[in-house]
Every structure is written in structure tokens, then in C-alpha cells.
């Protein structure tokens, strides 16, 4: 940067006045007139103004005839380097008298938070030193890296060649060695360093992470290594006593807010932090707020604000998380996943109703009562869940209604919870047209009576053994009568492949008319079907389900049979049926 420009900036403390904290000129620089987010940065400030300076050597700590820290008129403390200018002849910090090497004196300025540096300047009240090192820290003083060196002998002092006129030759910024500060007519001197002087031309701060890292600092350290005295002092010989003297240490920079804030403020703990916008938070606006993670955090640029977006949860969640895989699959548009959806909603965006609820078409999706309970009838419905769009519950046979709360036309209510609605009976055939006369039943079949012992041999001779509950009266369909049943337990399954659940039991119409077997709605029965004696072609003329044709046995259920049948079932699985 040209010397005349530094002189303009540093005269009469104009920078400190221009860079004092305050509200931005625009009401909200982080948003345009349409309230769309845009990149914004804090104003240029003197980051060192009013900050404490830690000096390794200060004249007057031990009182002498020149300096006395207890006397305001003779005190030359390091705080004078960063105090606001207000006197015609500024007071200067002075180091102790230095008589022999090493002549190193360090001035350290903690900036309080990360800043993006523009320049560093230091005005000397006496002849400026001929060797100075400028360092920065990005971790509040835990580690240091050089920003630049200033020397009349770069190779001897720092092992570096003088800085080329066109900047560094490498692809990224580097600490170069510049000429030592020049003495001025008033007897002092000026150290002026532009941070951009150490970076190659053409790098764009918005789009260069390397340059962003280069200009970022939380602390600045100036190391004065060789005073301006005659002769070479590197050999450590005794010289004329000398002390460094300087004033107006300025660190021009902006609060590092990554393009998401236009100013910095003091928080409740007195720490300097960015006044973050665009859904960001943190001292440097370097992360998204907890609910603003629909896309990953990015630094704002002049082309794109990269504002953090709130997750789309339709007002039903307060927390969400970011999923990179979903973000990629969406074409880098949305990656938020809502957590702990409320108001009976579910889904990534809390956009549908959870199981047992359905969407109320009369309310918007963001309404707290957008999801209504299915309220399926405990007897008439086959389950507790309903269609999430229409609210229709799954009804049992013969049951209808949105909640399955009434019998369908042609059905009447029964006392069975298995089949709450049965087909309305139609008048049966007259005595003249009855296919089986009462007097013929005795010769046709005889209902099972008395006790019945189930042996392994009898069990193995049957195709299947199941426990069924009759849901309604039988319905004659030609030569077969159909009884709706529920299979409650399966002890043996043969070719019929009996399974638990709703089914049908087919009984020959002649047998059903004579009560062989006699099946009553709501009762449970043991069905031993098939086996030797079963009628040939017994499946002809009937539908899917179980059959109780000749050779089958239907007995009123006894709970005591459960253990016996399970034991026979285990013996069958061990292959005992082949020996029975």
C-alpha cells in the first residue's frame, strides 16, 4: 500500500474516530429491499483500540530518573499504544534501556475475537528499529505464525530473500521480508503493513479459503529485534544504551462474521461477538442455529448469501438434524429431518399422520389438529388403523361405516365378537320341498354324542386338526352349506393348509340339515378333518376353506384338550405318526 495512503489514514487519529462501533448506515444491511438475505460485513475498525497491550519490557516498572509507572507524568505504559488519541503530542510507550543483545521486545495485543485483518501499523517516537517480526495467532495466543518481516538484512536476520515487487511467487499467501521501517523527518518512523501484500494477486477473499485463513487473527504480536544504533549488534557486544519507543498501534480489520453479520456487539459476558443474521449463530456466525439445518452452513459471498434455512416441519417439531445423503439426493436443496414430530404427525417433514390417525381435510397441514384419531369400532373393525387420507377403518365381513360401527344392508347384528354382523336369514324350504325328510336323518347320519378320547393314532389319521369359532349360521350353496368361522388354533395342517384367521367351513347340505354336525354361532369346536373315510371328490362344488365332509369329526371344544393336542403335535413333529 502506498506510503501516502498510510499517512492519510494515520493522521490525527482519523481512523479511530471513523472505526468506532456503531449501528450500520442501512437499517438492515444483511437483507435487501425484498427482505431477501444478502452478504453483509461489519465496518472497518481499529481492532486494537482500547485493547490491553502486553509488553515484555516497559520503562518505569522500576522507577528511575526517566520513567516511573506510579507517576502519570512520567509513566510510559504499553496501554498508551492503543489508547484513543486526544493530545497534540501523543504520549509514547518506552521499553527499558537495552545495553547488550538480545534486544528482543515483544508487544502482544489480544483482539478479543477473530478479525479479518486489512493492515497493521505502528508509529515510532524515536528512530525505528532495523528488524521487526510481525506475527499472528488464530487460537487466542496458543500458537503463532508469521505475517511478515521487516529488516535491513533479511537474509541474515530471517533467512529470507527480500520480497519481490510483484508479491509472492507461490500459489498462496506467505510471510515475506520487507524493508525496515524508514526514519522520518520528525525523528520517528512508521511501520505500515498491508495483509494483502503477502498474498498473490488475483485471490478473491469470498472464494479463497486459503486467503480467508491468511487474514484471520485473534491476536497480533510485534517483535522488535534490533534497535537503530550504529554498528552490527548481532554479536551481543556492549553498545550505547537504547530503548524502543512507539505510539499509535493500529490493527485495521473487520469482525470475522463470514458474511452473515453487519456489526459486532458485546454479549452478556462482555465478549465481542457478531450480531448474526441469516439463521446463523456463534461468535463468528460459523454455524447454523439448531433448527436452521435444512442445508449445510456456508460462508456468504457477493453472489450468494448462503443463509441457513429452517427445517420444513409444518409447525409440528422444534428440533431437526441434517442428513447429507438426503441433501445430495434432493439435488442439494434440502437435507433437514424433523425430530420428535408432535400433534400426532410423522415423517421427515411431519407431513403425514402417524398410525391410528388420519388427515382432517378441513384443516391446513400446519394446524395443530390436522390429524384426527381413527376411532375404529373395537368390535366391528378388523384393526385400529385407518386410511390416512379418507379415515376409513378396515371393517369385518358384513360391517360398514367410516368407523365400522353398523351392519351392512342384508346383514344383522349377532352376539359374536368374531362375526358381529351375519347375513339376514331367508325362509328355508317347505316340508314338501325339503331335500331331507326328518325321518331320513336317523338313517343318514348321527350327531356325535358322549365323550371322545383323542389318541395319537386318531390324531395322525386326520389331515388337519384345528380349533374354530363359528361366526354365524350356515348359508346353503347347492350341495354345500358355508359357515363363516375364525380359526383360533392349528394343531395339525395337511393338504388344506389350515391357518389362523378368518375362513369358511363347508359342510354337506344334507349333513347340516340333520345337525351332523350341529354348529351354533358364537361357539367353539374342534375340527378333525379328512383322513380315511372322507368322501371322494369332497371338494367339488364348494369354495375355499375347511370342509367337514364324511370322515371328518366336529366336537364342541373343551379347554382341557389344549395340552393333549399340543403334546400330540410335538410327537407328530418328531415323526411318531409313522409308527402309530
UniProtKB/Swiss-Prot annotation:
SMART domains found in the cross-reference section: C345C, EGF_Lam, LamNT
Keywords, ordered alphabetically: Disulfide bond, Extracellular matrix, Glycoprotein, Laminin EGF-like domain, Repeat, Secreted, Signal
Tissue specificity field: Very low levels at 10.5 to 12.5 dpc in dorsal root ganglia. High levels in motor neurons at 13.5, 14.5 and 15.5 dpc. At 11.5 dpc also expressed in the developing limb buds.
GO CC annotation terms, alphabetical: extracellular region; Golgi apparatus
Domain Laminin EGF-like per the UniProt entry, residue ranges: 255-310, 311-373, 374-423
Motif mapping: Cell attachment site: 500-502
Domain Laminin N-terminal: 36-254
Residues of this chain annotated as glycosylated in UniProt: 104, 387
BP GO annotations: axonogenesis; myoblast fusion; regulation of DNA-templated transcription
Subcellular location: Secreted, Extracellular space, Extracellular matrix
Disulfide bonds: 92-125, 255-264, 257-274, 276-285, 288-308, 311-320, 313-338, 341-350, 353-371, 374-386, 376-393, 395-404, 407-421, 441-514, 460-577
PANTHER family attached to this UniProt entry: NETRIN-3, NETRIN/LAMININ-RELATED
The protein, known as: Netrin-3
Biological source species: Mus musculus (Mouse)
Lineage: Eukaryota, Metazoa, Chordata, Craniata, Vertebrata
